């Protein structure tokens, strides 16, 4: 019994320590992403506005979600609806990420399908509407349990409880997590995005193979689009790789019962680690990001003067 207690304590301490480290990396990395887009005029395009939206969601994970996840892991005694609201916040920014990724995929699709009309279709007003819709959907999906789909209104045991030890499973219904949050608002968008990127790659490949024009500009355009699409598909792949294990754990919990705490912790940490991955991907895969990262490092970290950025489009 004492050995189990010691192992659980060690697991809790390790989990909290890793959460803090991931949170700090996520905040610093994604603040850099926003800084890069602000500094580099060539990155101030529709796609990168959605990337900024994704970065804001990842910053929120570092600032809000991880501290709240730590509080929930400690099982602090608080009011039921306070605990429920904290768990809902954990979900809002997950869905903000998936909605931002969906917006990015749709934008790249329009870019290659409507080459000539793209700028007329993606007006500033429509971009802001799309961003607002992404966040509105995220808040509505994440806050749904506050309107009744929770353990208090559906469980006899919790109905008369005012204060409780705040645990995710104490307030959040697993049928909501599995059928609504995962199947409807994570899995279906992921499948749609994979289909979009497959079509993007198919269109670009056809355009490059057709060689219908002798213009080097056309070939260069689709070459850049192919590289950008590959980079953004990698971001999508990492999101799926990071979040699907935790969603599968939730499915196992709902259909077959509890999983070991250490497995749950690993799933949570992997999902949260996704928030610090994207800045690394951008640095390695998108040339303009790498150049601006280096500019920031030279100018602000080692106080070395650097040439200003050009405004050419990547």
From Swiss-Prot:
Membrane protein topology class: Multi-pass membrane protein
Record GO cellular component, one term: dendrite
Superkingdom as given in the UniProt entry: Eukaryota
Entry-linked SMART domains: 7TM_GPCR_Srsx
Disulfide bonds: 83-166
GO molecular function: G protein-coupled adenosine receptor activity
Keyword Lipoprotein attributed: yes
Covalent lipid sites (S-palmitoyl cysteine): 303
CDD domains: 7tmA_Adenosine_R_A3
Membrane topology (Extracellular): 1-14, 73-84, 149-177, 256-261
Major localization listed first in the record, in broad terms: membrane
Residues modified by glycosylation: 4, 12, 160
GO biological process: G protein-coupled adenosine receptor signaling pathway; negative regulation of cell migration; negative regulation of cell population proliferation
Transmembrane intervals: 15-37, 49-72, 85-106, 127-148, 178-198, 232-255, 262-284
Keyword entries, A-Z: Cell membrane, Disulfide bond, G-protein coupled receptor, Glycoprotein, Lipoprotein, Membrane, Palmitate, Receptor, Transducer, Transmembrane, Transmembrane helix
Localization terms from the record: Cell membrane
Membership in a protein family: Belongs to the G-protein coupled receptor 1 family.
Summary of the function given for this chain in its UniProt record: Receptor for adenosine. The activity of this receptor is mediated by G proteins which inhibits adenylyl cyclase.
This protein's name: Adenosine receptor A3
Gene encoding the protein: ADORA3
């Amino acid at each position: 019994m004492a050995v189990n207690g010691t192992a659980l304590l060690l697991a809790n301490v390790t989990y909290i320590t890793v959460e803090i480290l991931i949170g700090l990396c996520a905040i610093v990395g994604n603040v850099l992403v926003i800084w890069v887009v602000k500094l580099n005029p060539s990155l101030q395009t529709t796609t990168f506005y959605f990337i900024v939206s994704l970065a804001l969601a990842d910053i929120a994970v570092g600032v809000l979600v991880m501290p709240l996840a730590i509080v929930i892991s400690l099982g602090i005694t608080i009011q039921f609806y306070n605990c429920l609201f904290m768990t809902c916040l954990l979900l809002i920014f997950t869905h903000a990420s998936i909605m931002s990724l969906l917006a990015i995929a749709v934008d790249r699709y329009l870019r290659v399908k409507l080459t000539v009309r793209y700028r007329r279709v993606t007006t500033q007003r429509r971009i802001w509407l799309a961003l607002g819709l992404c966040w509105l959907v995220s808040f509505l999906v994440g806050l749904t349990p506050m309107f009744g789909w929770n353990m208090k209104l559906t469980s006899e045991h919790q109905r008369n409880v005012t204060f409780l030890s705040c645990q995710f499973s104490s307030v959040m219904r697993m049928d909501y997590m599995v059928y609504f949050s995962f199947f409807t608002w994570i899995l279906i968008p992921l499948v749609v995005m994979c289909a979009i990127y497959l079509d993007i790659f198919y269109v670009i490949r056809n355009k490059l193979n057709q060689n219908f024009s002798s213009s080097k500009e056309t070939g260069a355009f689709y070459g850049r689009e192919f590289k950008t699409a590959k980079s953004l598909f990698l971001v999508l792949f990492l999101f799926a790789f990071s979040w699907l294990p935790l969603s599968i754990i939730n499915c196992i919990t709902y259909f077959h019962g509890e999983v070991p705490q250490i497995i749950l912790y690993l799933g949570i940490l992997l999902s949260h680690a996704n928030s610090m991955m994207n800045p690394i991907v951008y640095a390695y895969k998108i040339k303009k990001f790498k150049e601006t990262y280096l500019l920031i490092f030279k100018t602000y970290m080692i106080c070395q003067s650097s040439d200003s950025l050009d405004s050419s489009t990547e």
